[in-house]
């Protein structure tokens, strides 16, 4: 693994542990060249997923982009980082388990919305406002009218 500080190609693994959910390996590394320490996380990738955008462009699936979107929706909400990681892992597993190499972006968006609906109503509305491109207050009002009032 290349050192992110100095670019040295030969680094040493000092510690390896599975993550809490067991879906990845967390490795603590040391660079003998610059004496810096850093952490890497390794995950099993079952297949290369391709996202089909609305305009039919195809781009490689970006797990980090999915995580950023979910973190943005959950910003300042009472959901910890470990839970967010489990949410992201769950969505990625569903996408990989679908058996499809190409996934429409709309399917990913709906999976995120379904998940956020169960986790946090405010995050659900935040994500929906971007995903469904709300332009005016009436868009929010119409969307909120479709929600279960007990949530």
Swiss-Prot record:
Record's cofactor remark: Binds 1 zinc ion.
Keyword Zinc part of the UniProt annotation: yes
Cofactor(s) needed: Zn(2+)
Top-rank taxon, per record: Bacteria
Ranges annotated as unnamed zinc finger: 3-34
GO molecular function, one term: ATP binding
Record-linked Pfam families: ATP-cone, Zn_ribbon_NrdR
Keyword Hydrolase: no
Occurrences of domain ATP-cone (ranges): 49-139
Record-level GO BP terms: negative regulation of DNA-templated transcription
Keywords, ordered alphabetically: ATP-binding, DNA-binding, Metal-binding, Nucleotide-binding, Repressor, Transcription, Transcription regulation, Zinc, Zinc-finger
Region span, Disordered: 1-21
InterPro entries recorded: ATP-cone_dom (IPR005144), NrdR-like_N (IPR055173), RNR_NrdR-like (IPR003796)
Biased composition (Basic and acidic residues): 11-21
Protein role: Negatively regulates transcription of bacterial ribonucleotide reductase nrd genes and operons by binding to NrdR-boxes.
Similarity annotation: Belongs to the NrdR family.
Matches recorded under HAMAP family: NrdR
UniProt protein name: Transcriptional repressor NrdR
Organism taxonomic ancestry: Bacteria, Pseudomonadati, Pseudomonadota, Alphaproteobacteria, Acetobacterales
Gene encoding the protein: nrdR
